[in-house]
Amino acid sequence: MARDLEALERRKAKVRRAIRAAANGRPRLSVHRTSKHIYAQIIDDAKGETLVAASSLEKDLRSSLKTGADVEAAKAIGKLVAERATAKGVTAVVFDRGAYIYHGRVKALAEGAREGGLQF
């Protein structure tokens, strides 16, 4: 168990280093997923503040989604976070997948954000 957690932290740190190198002042789109929900937030690391956030826990989305843990929910969250970001004037971000593999729900969220107008 401890080795698994160490491997997770190594993967997460490796991805975070790559993001810092490629960011060039752009905010990052951070993804967090659980077995029941998915969360996305756009963070400005220079200022240390969250600009935009969206999750499958929001009441207006919960009624329209079958569950918060599937690919359709992730795509909807991606589109929602992109809409909110463009409303605040953020169009270019760097994608932070964390320690998650770019597959399934994480990939769907990224595709939804691209469809919503974010560039990364």
Swiss-Prot record:
PANTHER family: 39S RIBOSOMAL PROTEIN L18, MITOCHONDRIAL (PTHR12899), LARGE RIBOSOMAL SUBUNIT PROTEIN UL18M (PTHR12899:SF3). Disulfide bonds: none annotated. Signal peptide: none annotated. This is one of the proteins that bind and probably mediate the attachment of the 5S RNA into the large ribosomal subunit, where it forms part of the central protuberance. One of its GO terms (cellular component) is ribosome. The keyword Ribonucleoprotein applies. This is Large ribosomal subunit protein uL18. Part of the 50S ribosomal subunit; part of the 5S rRNA/L5/L18/L25 subcomplex. Contacts the 5S and 23S rRNAs. GO terms for molecular function: 5S rRNA binding; structural constituent of ribosome. NCBIfam families: L18_bact. Belongs to the universal ribosomal protein uL18 family. GO terms for biological process: translation. The keyword RNA-binding applies. Keywords: Ribonucleoprotein, Ribosomal protein, RNA-binding, rRNA-binding. It comes from the Bacteria. It holds the Pfam family Ribosomal_L18p.
